[in-house]
């Protein structure tokens, strides 16, 4: 079940591979995510010391959250993947010029998972071409719908 989708990532990048990663979260963050109080639009993944970290994901604390814990809505969160997956991703990002972008936040058996994509950036003309393709498909669907009436 998807919690939130980063639509901007598909607009700005060509996503070539997808990986599912766990996230190291605190209790108040899990409650806030379950309530839908997060944003992954401006977030990105970095590699530091052979580990992956999610930066810029904003989680707003609930009003009923604990007062004795300091809440940092945009703290850096560690991503949890298998060592083989991490080494493969590090190799591609460092050599081939790929970027790691968060695509989707969802539940798997009660656990919160983040789908990250191995992606290459789109140029402005690529974005325009994609927009034209979407428009033509939309027009074709509209014409088919009108024809059936």
UniProtKB/Swiss-Prot annotation:
GO terms for molecular function: RNA binding. Coiled coil: none annotated. InterPro entries: SmpB, SsrA-bd_prot, SsrA-bd_prot_CS. GO terms for biological process: trans-translation. It holds the Pfam family SmpB. Keywords: Cytoplasm, RNA-binding. It is found in: Cytoplasm. One of its GO terms (cellular component) is cytosol. It comes from the Bacteria. Residues 127-149 have a biased composition (Basic and acidic residues). Residues 121-149 are annotated as: Disordered. Required for rescue of stalled ribosomes mediated by trans-translation. Binds to transfer-messenger RNA (tmRNA), required for stable association of tmRNA with ribosomes. tmRNA and SmpB together mimic tRNA shape, replacing the anticodon stem-loop with SmpB. tmRNA is encoded by the ssrA gene; the 2 termini fold to resemble tRNA(Ala) and it encodes a 'tag peptide', a short internal open reading frame. During trans-translation Ala-aminoacylated tmRNA acts like a tRNA, entering the A-site of stalled ribosomes, displacing the stalled mRNA. PANTHER family: SSRA-BINDING PROTEIN, TMRNA-BINDING COMPONENT OF TRANS-TRANSLATION TAGGING COMPLEX. NCBIfam families: PRK05422.1 (NF003843), smpB (TIGR00086). Belongs to the SmpB family. This is SsrA-binding protein. It comes from Dechloromonas aromatica (strain RCB). The lineage of its organism: Bacteria, Pseudomonadati, Pseudomonadota, Betaproteobacteria, Rhodocyclales. The gene is smpB.
């Amino acid at each position: 079940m998807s919690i939130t989708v980063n639509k901007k990532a598909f607009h700005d990048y060509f996503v070539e591979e997808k990986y599912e990663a766990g996230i190291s979260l605190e209790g108040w963050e899990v409650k806030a995510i379950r309530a839908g109080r997060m944003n992954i639009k401006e977030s990105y993944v970095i590699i530091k010391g052979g580990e992956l970290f999610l930066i810029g994901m904003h989680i707003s604390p609930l009003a009923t959250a604990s007062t004795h814990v300091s809440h940092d809505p945009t703290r850096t969160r560690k991503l949890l993947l298998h060592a083989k997956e991490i080494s493969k991703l590090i190799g591609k990002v460092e050599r081939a010029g790929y970027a790691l972008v968060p695509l989707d936040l969802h539940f798997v058996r009660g656990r919160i998972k983040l789908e990250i994509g191995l992606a290459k950036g789109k140029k402005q003309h690529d974005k325009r071409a994609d927009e034209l393709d979407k428009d033509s498909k939309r027009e074709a669907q509209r014409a088919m719908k009108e024809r059936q009436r």
